[in-house]
From Swiss-Prot:
Its main location: cytoplasm. This is Large ribosomal subunit protein eL18y. It comes from Arabidopsis thaliana (Mouse-ear cress). One of its GO terms (biological process) is translation. Keywords: Cytoplasm, Ribonucleoprotein, Ribosomal protein. Belongs to the eukaryotic ribosomal protein eL18 family.
Length: 187
């Protein structure tokens, strides 16, 4: 017995209709944005709602240095990130800016507020910009995760820059490949 597929033998791609997380605050934010999507004709709210459903991997964090870079010349607008804002010690001067995010690390929040900026939550944003007016929607770098470094063509294949999964970093483990007989081959 097979299964009856309606779309002529293709199973449709699935997409999330609710967050997987049991976080009650996230669920309340979703409830609020569901209402806004239904009652307003704003694309911004739809994007926010879709991103609230995403998995943690797809809600990449954004560092203060990138935030400052992206917001240069847009200091009067509100930066919006569905994810975490993290501190970056490499940046010394922070302009006063308004930032909305799901969470802020302790130091990032302290530094933004010390510079005369504001750290907003999504329910505060909904009151200030119900249609997303004067906002800059940002995303963190998804491919900066450690795990992503291992993806791609197999390590050892020509022109591959994938990181091998190595048990240890010692002399005997994937060191001197091509220079020593015992380590793969010798040229």
């Amino acid at each position: 017995m097979g299964i009856d597929l309606i779309a002529g033998g293709k199973s449709k791609k699935t997409k999330r209709t609710a967050p997987k997380s049991d976080d009650v605050y996230l669920k309340l934010t979703v409830k609020l944005y569901r209402f806004l999507v239904r009652r307003t004709n704003s694309k911004f709210n739809g994007v926010i709602l879709k991103r609230l459903f995403m998995s943690k991997v797809n809600k990449a964090p954004l560092s203060l240095s990138r935030l400052v870079e992206f917001m240069t010349g847009k200091e009067d607008k509100i930066a919006v990130l569905v994810g975490t804002i993290t501190d970056d010690l490499r940046v010394h001067e922070i302009p006063a800016m308004k930032v909305t995010a799901l969470r802020f690390t302790e130091r990032a929040r302290a530094r933004i507020e010390k510079a005369g900026g504001e750290c907003l939550t999504f329910d505060q944003l909904a009151l200030r910009a119900p249609l997303g007016q004067n906002t800059v929607l940002l995303r963190g770098p998804k491919n900066s995760r450690e795990a992503v470094k291992h993806f791609g063509p197999a390590p050892g294949v020509p022109h591959s820059h994938s990181k091998p999964y190595v048990r240890a970093k010692g002399r005997k483990f994937e060191k001197a490949r091509g220079k020593r007989k015992s380590r793969g081959f010798k040229v």
